[in-house]
Amino acid sequence: VTEGLGPRLVEGGATFGVWAPKVTSLAVRAGGRVVELERHERGVWRGAVEGLAAGDDYLLVLDGQRERPDPRSRFQPHGVHGPSRLVDLGPPPAPFATPALRDLIFYELHCGTFTPEGTFDAAAGRLGHLVDLGVTAVEVMPVAAFPGSRGWGYDGVALYAVHAAYGGPDGFRRFVDACHGAGLAVFLDVVYNHLGPDGNYLGEFGPYFTDRATTPWGDAVNLDGPGSDFVRGLILDNAEQWVTGYGVDGLRLDAVHELHDRSSVHILEELAERVHAARPGALVVAESDLHQPLLVTAYGLDAMWDDDLHHALHVAVTGETSGYYDGFQDLGALAKALETGWVFIGQYYPFLDRRHGRDPAGLGGERFVVCSQNHDQVGNRAFGERLATLAGPDLDAVASVLVACSPFLPLLFQGQEWGETRPFLFFTDHGPGLASAVRQGRRAEFAAFDWADEVPDPNDPATFERSKLDWDRAGGPVLELWQALLRLRREVPALGNCRRDLTTARADPERRLVTLERSDPSGSRAVVVANLGQRSQHIPFDTGKLRLRVATRPISPSGDLSGASAAVWTT
């Protein structure tokens, strides 16, 4: 039903298709002219404007009065409240062979803070570092246009428009091409569960939102009510745009548990089908906190973010047990997370005060993306502390070893590879009214911790600047550790096979030891021992013919593993 919607450049001008059942008239204002569009079935308006070309700006005029950007605008160079710009993306991207799912090693970056310049072009200049690190995929936090110049991107309002401050659509296309030229796949974080409050005009066009459900961030998207065919189409066409128009190799779907859909065919199933058909080899990864195997087994998604390993690691190295960390206190939770993926597979979870999760039996380890840091787990803290700050560099290294040697797909968060200690804070760029509300809300969120007066102001430009990586630190022993770990993952079949069924993990709470064993049908074997305590402990197995490959701290001649350290042996 959405065929022909959006702006399209044609010979001699441009055509426009807009779903706007709420308006009685709709026109395009461009080049000093106002051209009325014609209403068709189901509230779709269509028309053409002669003489327009790529680079021309335009606005939609609703009911002869309100001037608004196009819901399918590909560029908002003057901000989310200003006119839209016609864009020619050029020829289709050159083919790129996306790595096999099990070979993915993700590097999550935020374009605005990854480099001092905060642009796609500047980020492209750092790709050599990522290649040397050993990752295989760059996961870019949301780039859909959002208010102002600074933000995480999760309050985007123009889903098709690439954020101007980063370099707009041309900059993003160059970045994707540069990644492919360096042999790196590109995954894009997209947000379909809500739109931000600032610059969100979709509700003036049609029933894009529903009052049947809400999300923690605002109105839920109308995926199953009257008019939802067009709302779903906005999402599905957008997903296809990224993988075909820009050459993105995969999508990371934000918080899919907040996609409220009672349709016969769930939006996730339809989206996976669309992406896989539009670009064979393209992948879809979902963030969900519901522990539902059906995301893969029924809906056809390729993988899921797995927070349980993060939570178990975080508790083990920091001792924090409040909030959603309650339930991960036992060191056995870490062993279970390393073996199973999810700790909660149907048992009681104190944080929720109910049973939680389902056994992911039959799913390979390549269906889970794991980390010890990501934008959420760092940035949603009041002060955005990195794990190296909270736990110290030694235990941070232990967590890194367990993530890299797990049977799952590892993800690093920007700067983690050199032990970055600069925070990743929550930052925004709103007008005075909304900025005040966000500031007060942020302080109220952490008032129980007596931090209310100290929480950084999200709208202060200094908060954003403090979150930028310190590239002067991009080196040293932490980087060498990660390079060694990722090299082992590539070279040792037992570490790279993602075989949960050939993985065992044991915890010794008394000695604060966790032992992880991996094997492969080829005969390859790997053993990882992590000492999460402060005292040296004797290595709990006969190393035999295994060769020591990595040790985060020296192992004594008598075979004792130092406190707060980990080591890896392989055949």
Where are these regions (language model features)?
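Conserved alpha/beta catalytic core and glycan-binding cleft of carbohydrate-active enzymes
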Residues: 80, 268, 272-448
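Short proline/glycine-enriched turn/loop motifs at strand-loop junctions of beta-rich domains
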Residues: 19-25, 533-535, 543-544
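Core domains of carbohydrate- and sulfate-ester-processing enzymes
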Residues: 62-95, 182, 201-216, 324-353, ...
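Substrate-binding/active-site clefts of carbohydrate-active enzymes
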Residues: 98-101, 106, 110-250, 255-283, ...
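The feature marks proteins involved in alpha-glucan
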Residues: 1-11, 15, 36-108, 113-118, ...
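Glycan-recognition and catalytic regions of carbohydrate-active enzymes
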Residues: 340-357, 412-413, 418-427, 452-526
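Short, well-ordered beta-strand segments enriched in hydrophobic/aromatic residues
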Residues: 16-18, 525-531
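C-terminal beta-strand-rich structural cap/linker in extracellular carbohydrate-active enzymes
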Residues: 20, 54-56, 557-571
